């Protein structure tokens, strides 16, 4: 199937609202979370439009997928420095964690050649802890 010229550069109100949602949140978001944030800018925005735009932004390289083991995929701005994630078990939000443990590849031992790694910590975020305190 041939791409329409300029399709990847298409910038609609919906696309702008979805981009703004990621920039304002500054953390990985699920499509439902994107919808909730972007609807403040574009009334009547639907989940199908969010999915279409997420796919287009992935193709453009503006977004990157974050696959959580045993969980749903969330999305974040691409081009960030190497980092890891924290998943809140209470509210299901995902947060970026800066930095990396030095020599983490040594955990694999000598039998394996590590090409890359992803670390996800699970627990309760500060907002949820404050509610239960």
Question: Locations of the language-model features?
Answer:
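Short capping segments at the starts of secondary-structure elements
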Residues: 13, 24-30
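Short alpha-helical segments that sit at the start of domains
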Residues: 1-20
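Basic amphipathic alpha-helical segments that dock to polyanions
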Residues: 50-60
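DNA-recognition alpha helix
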Residues: 30-43
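Non-DNA-binding regulatory cores of transcription-related proteins
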Residues: 62-65, 69-133
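Short amphipathic alpha-helical elements of helix-turn-helix/winged-helix folds
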Residues: 17-25, 37
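Short coil turns linking two alpha-helices in DNA-binding domains
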Residues: 46-47
């Amino acid at each position: 199937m041939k791409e329409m010229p300029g399709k990847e550069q298409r910038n609609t109100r919906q696309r702008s609202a979805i981009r703004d949602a990621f920039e304002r949140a500054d953390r990985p978001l699920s499509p439902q979370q994107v919808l909730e944030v972007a609807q403040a800018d574009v009334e009547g925005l639907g989940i199908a439009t969010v999915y279409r735009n997420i796919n287009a932004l992935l193709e453009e390289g503006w977004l990157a997928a974050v696959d959580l083991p045993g969980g749903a995929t969330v999305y974040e701005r691409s081009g960030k420095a190497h980092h890891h994630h924290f998943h809140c078990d209470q509210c299901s939000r995902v947060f970026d964690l800066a930095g990396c443990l030095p020599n983490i590849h040594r955990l694999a031992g000598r039998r394996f050649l590590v090409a890359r790694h992803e670390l996800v910590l699970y627990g309760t975020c500060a907002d949820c802890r404050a509610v239960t305190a």
